[in-house]
């Protein structure tokens, strides 16, 4: 397990302090730390079984949407009343948390848990889109571009798996990575299925 479920992952680090904090966070979960180029785009999980793409989802980081009335803390409480949300993997979705990572994300927007975001403003509480950290998933199987599908199948075949999940970053999954960029973040030999 090195960084599974988004543990120890930090993205969009822009200052030396953020890099140092991200490195320290990663070291809490593994003695080895990998630093990679940041790829712009939405987080997708492409599920390949026996050489076929069987499902694709776009994952969105845990967030709240402002209403101009309630604080971020109150909005988190409201989101967490959704009966589909639980602790860990007990339910389809995981409850949102106001913790150090959420504080860092809010600080980037010059906000705190006591801030009242304007109506329709999205406030991300995580930089990664894992369901295990409060993220949500949207099915995109029917719109994935054939080049992106084939790339996922080739990746899983290249590492010798019958079942695998490809974490793929793209600004538009319906367009080819060959024309708009994007790329594989990682391949998972034991991918979670609950997002599909």
For each feature predicted by the language model, list its residue ranges.
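Active-site nucleotide/adenylate-binding loops and adjacent lid/helix of ATP-dependent enzymes
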Residues: 1-97, 145-150
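A short, surface-exposed helix-loop junction/capping segment
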Residues: 2-4, 113-137
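Glycine-centered small-residue hotspots that permit tight backbone geometry or close packing
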Residues: 3-6, 120, 164, 195
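Short, functional N-terminal and low-complexity linear motifs
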Residues: 12, 115-123, 174-178
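ATP-dependent carboxylate activation and anion-phosphoryl transfer catalytic cores
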Residues: 38, 48, 52-55, 60-67, ...
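Oxyanion-binding "anion nests"
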Residues: 78-124
